[in-house]
Amino acid sequence: MCIRDSEYAASINCQNIHVIAGITGKTQEAEETFRENLRYATQKASNHGITILIEPLNLLDTPGYHLSDLDHAIETQDAVNKPNLKIMFDCYHIQVMQGNLLLRLKEHLPRIGHIQFANCPGRTEPDSGEINFPWLFAEIDSIGWEGYLGAEYIPKKSTEDSLGWIRNSL
């Protein structure tokens, strides 16, 4: 994270900055560097009341990605030990790597800073795959999530036509 990123984010009232782990060899040196960079980023961001988000990405779509599952993200969060380091819980990536979305959401809700979604397989719109999003959205609401939900998917049709899922999900 650039030193000025948190200043820029604060100037537009942005509350979160998503940082990527990158494609690395899964070495101890890479892990130590990642954690040290997160300590630096969280310290700079905390001066502006900003949260740093880390996102596990599945290894099928992103081979070699350093942070590839929720357990590793939790270990990283614990090691860095900063209150403004949270997890971007991407339902698509978690489903591909580990599944059991609702259990993981319930268990780790205080660690989560943002929830993203797309369906499996293929990172498609929410009404076109194996995840029952109307049910999951209702469950997310019932467990007390007060943050944003972000759609990040690759539409099978035009963007406008792909938004039909909203009527059935809200």
Model regions and ranges:
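Active-site acidic/histidine proton-transfer and metal-coordination neighborhood
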Residues: 4-86, 96
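Histidine-acidic metal/acid-base catalytic patches
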Residues: 13, 51, 67-89, 93-170
